[in-house]
């Protein structure tokens, strides 16, 4: 039996809802698995976030097909950042400690 427990709304949920409505100013683009947003603070030029749509609590909450697409989108974002930023490599970070919803920090280095 599927657990129908409702996940708490997070800032990730709000950003995705705003992106869907065209109200999120930091949107870079829509990708198959979600949304790419500029990081609120550009501590490294080109820092972006990948937010899944629909929002899920963790990578492990995605089915195999959705998980594969999310990770492929993540790596394609990295490829694009290498091209436009001149970065040597890209750091990818999935934490979820502060906001308990899947999102990836994609940081050019």
Which residues make up each language-model segment?
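HIT superfamily nucleotide-processing domains
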Residues: 1-109
